[in-house]
């Protein structure tokens, strides 16, 4: 940690930023490490479970101080509280008096010159700051747009709840952005969308892109390869992600039920591996379909990526930049993605990855790659080169000191 000339930093995030093994933690982890290069950082965050709490030592090794609070708010009660108070339910779900008190204590006791809030649900912990203290709001994604998309065409109470959350959360996001010195989003596409709905300028709303750990996610790195039994002999298609997350669940369900039968008509021994922790019952049930494997949590996702003939990202709802796509491309694998999953990534379609508009086209593009080994190899090589050229974390986070210093 360096003391520099700006004082200290308070970093608030909705999950402990260790380990960097899921989308939100990958960004928060790398952002925290960048902040620690600038000044001492005090970290306030929540833990989803005992596993999260077990990383307190690792967080303590790089932070000046920390407050980790187990998160056990009921979704139902948070929803009712949000409705009663006119709050977004996402904010009510993460509300906690201990965090409010800790933030006030840190601001009073330490020479904090900048507060960085990560994700919309942490913004309400940031009080009105004294003159000279900067408030940087990293929204990451435009969450209100995600809930609006959930509610579109969805009837019944759940549809109403999602549409209401989209409206109320957008109002909250706009109010926070007006108060913050600067707000950041994971891609220029996401930042541009928020500028359009908020009326704020490029000076107030900027892109702060994700990167990828190029030395770690490299075909030349040292990692445990799949055994012949795990790999199998037929074509292997792989999806990676947190498997209790709705967009991921819907993506693998569509691919397993619609795309895989068409692929297996041409390749009866083709397999689709769904790789990621916390699969729901609905995801686990997909393993009963021909050629579908559900791995659950794996020690190292690189073994599955390296073994894949094609990595697929068939998301229908996606915000920001998909780390799963960056990681697969960094591993030099050919990727077939939906337009939604590729949005925000600075690549050329058909040169760095293939993009499909529906489940039928996803199957067709996978079959195209399986039939043309040279195309597959060229696509993977170009994908890796583009990640090296464009998405090194040191480059994507190079603007952070200016955001903090003003």
Language model regions located:
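Acceptor-binding helix/loop patch of EC 2.4 sugar-transfer enzymes
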Residues: 14, 73-93, 133-174, 192
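Nucleotide-activated donor-binding/catalytic signature segment of Leloir-type glycosyltransferases, i.e.
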Residues: 65, 267-303
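Acidic anion/phosphate-binding donor-loop and adjacent secondary structure
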Residues: 148-149, 195, 212-228
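Acidic donor-binding loop of glycosyltransferase active sites
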Residues: 181, 291, 306-320, 331-334
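Carbohydrate-associated surface elements
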Residues: 189, 208-211
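Short hydrophobic beta-strand element within catalytic cores of glycosyltransferases
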Residues: 324-327, 334-338
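Conserved acidic donor-binding segment of nucleotide-sugar-dependent glycosyltransferases
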Residues: 353-360, 368-374
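A short, well-ordered alpha-helix in the C-terminal region of glycosyltransferases
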Residues: 375-389, 399
């Amino acid at each position: 940690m360096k003391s520099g000339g700006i004082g200290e930093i308070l970093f608030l995030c909705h999950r402990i930023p260790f380990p960097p093994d899921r989308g939100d933690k990958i960004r928060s982890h790398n952002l925290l490490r960048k902040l620690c290069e600038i000044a001492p950082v005090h970290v306030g965050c929540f833990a989803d479970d005992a596993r999260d709490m077990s990383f307190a030592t690792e967080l303590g090794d790089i932070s000046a101080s920390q407050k980790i609070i187990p998160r056990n708010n009921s979704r139902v009660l948070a929803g009712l509280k949000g409705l009663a108070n006119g709050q977004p339910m996402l904010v009510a779900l993460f509300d906690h008096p201990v965090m409010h008190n800790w933030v006030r204590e840190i601001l009073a006791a330490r020479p904090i010159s900048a507060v960085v809030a990560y994700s919309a649900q942490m913004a309400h912990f940031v009080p009105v700051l004294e003159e000279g203290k900067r408030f940087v709001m990293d929204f990451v994604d435009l969450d209100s747009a995600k809930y609006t998309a959930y509610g579109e065409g969805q009837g019944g109470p759940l549809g109403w709840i999602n549409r209401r959350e989209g409206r109320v959360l957008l109002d909250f996001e706009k109010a926070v952005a007006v108060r913050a010195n600067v707000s950041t989003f994971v891609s220029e596409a996401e930042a541009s969308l928020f500028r359009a709905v908020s009326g704020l300028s490029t000076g107030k709303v900027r892109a702060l892109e994700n990167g990828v750990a190029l030395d770690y996610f490299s075909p030349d790195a040292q990692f445990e390869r799949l055994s012949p039994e795990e790999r199998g002999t037929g074509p292997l298609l792989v999806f990676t992600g947190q498997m209790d997350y709705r967009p991921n669940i819907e993506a693998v369900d569509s691919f397993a039920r619609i795309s895989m039968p068409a692929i297996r008509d041409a390749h009866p021994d083709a397999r689709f591996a769904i790789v990621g922790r916390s699969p729901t019952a609905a995801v686990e049930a997909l393993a009963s379909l021909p050629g579908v494997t559900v791995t659950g949590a794996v020690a190292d996702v690189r073994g599955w990526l390296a073994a894949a003939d094609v990595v697929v990202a068939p998301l229908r709802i996606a915000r920001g930049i998909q780390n799963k796509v960056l990681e697969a491309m960094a591993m030099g694998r050919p990727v077939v993605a939906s337009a939604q999953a590729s949005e925000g990534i600075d690549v050329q379609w058909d040169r760095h990855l293939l993009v499909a508009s529906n489940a039928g086209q996803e199957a067709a593009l996978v079959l195209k790659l399986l039939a043309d080994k040279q195309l597959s190899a060229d696509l993977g090589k170009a994908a890796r080169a583009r990640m090296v050229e464009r998405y090194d974390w040191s480059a994507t986070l190079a603007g952070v000191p200016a955001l903090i210093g003003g």
